[in-house]
Amino acid sequence: MALSREEVAARYGAALFGYAQDNKVLDNVYDEMMELKKAVIATPQVISVLSDPILNSKDKKDFLTAIEKNFSEEVQGFLNLLLEYDRFAYLVDIIDQFAVLYDDKNKIASGTATTAVKLDDDQLKRLGDGFAKKYNLNTVRLENKVDPSILGGVILQVKDRVIDGSVKNKLKKIRAQIIDEN
């Protein structure tokens, strides 16, 4: 029975995480995998070539060797494993699963700060730091999404938590309170 895309990503992501952790190179492997993800998203032909069933394995290996020369031995070995087992089509999903495990271990969360106007990097960092402190996390990485309809304030969405401090939401609550009183 064939494994689903999610199952392949979970297995290989967990295997890479365990291997990197056991060999005490987790942070380095994480950094390299994030760089690799950026590169293959910018150049999707890399995955197409390495997943192409028509190309012979020697040509794929030669192509991979040219790409992987800047990576550590651990990452090179992992990429060769993906090539050997014909799993390169799942690379981005595997990296995403690896990143989830890395973030969980390091108490890192990612989320969105929705505001009426764009926030600068310092404001995003302070929001993230405040959320991290409140919820016992080491780091919260926030992406800023601009939505003028919230009028002001901020809506924070991190993992399964939503904190709606928008002016729109406060006005909605005041309106509901006035209606309830009448």
UniProtKB/Swiss-Prot annotation:
Query: One GO molecular function term?
Result: proton-transporting ATP synthase activity, rotational mechanism
Q: What is this protein called?
A: ATP synthase subunit delta
Q: Report which residue ranges the record marks as coiled coil.
A: none
User: Function, please?
Assistant: F(1)F(0) ATP synthase produces ATP from ADP in the presence of a proton or sodium gradient. F-type ATPases consist of two structural domains, F(1) containing the extramembraneous catalytic core and F(0) containing the membrane proton channel, linked together by a central stalk and a peripheral stalk. During catalysis, ATP synthesis in the catalytic domain of F(1) is coupled via a rotary mechanism of the central stalk subunits to proton translocation. This protein is part of the stalk that links CF(0) to CF(1). It either transmits conformational changes from CF(0) to CF(1) or is implicated in proton conduction.
Task: Tell me which domain of life the UniProt entry assigns to the organism this sequence originates from.
Answer: Bacteria
- Taxonomic lineage per UniProt? Bacteria, Bacillati, Bacillota, Bacilli, Lactobacillales
Q: Where does this protein come from, organism-wise?
A: Lactobacillus helveticus (strain DPC 4571)
Q: How does it assemble?
A: F-type ATPases have 2 components, F(1) - the catalytic core - and F(0) - the membrane proton channel. F(1) has five subunits: alpha(3), beta(3), gamma(1), delta(1), epsilon(1). F(0) has three main subunits: a(1), b(2) and c(10-14). The alpha and beta chains form an alternating ring which encloses part of the gamma chain. F(1) is attached to F(0) by a central stalk formed by the gamma and epsilon chains, while a peripheral stalk is formed by the delta and b chains.
Q: How does it sit in the membrane?
A: Peripheral membrane protein
Q: Name one GO cellular component term.
A: proton-transporting ATP synthase complex
Where's it found, cell-wise? Answer: Cell membrane
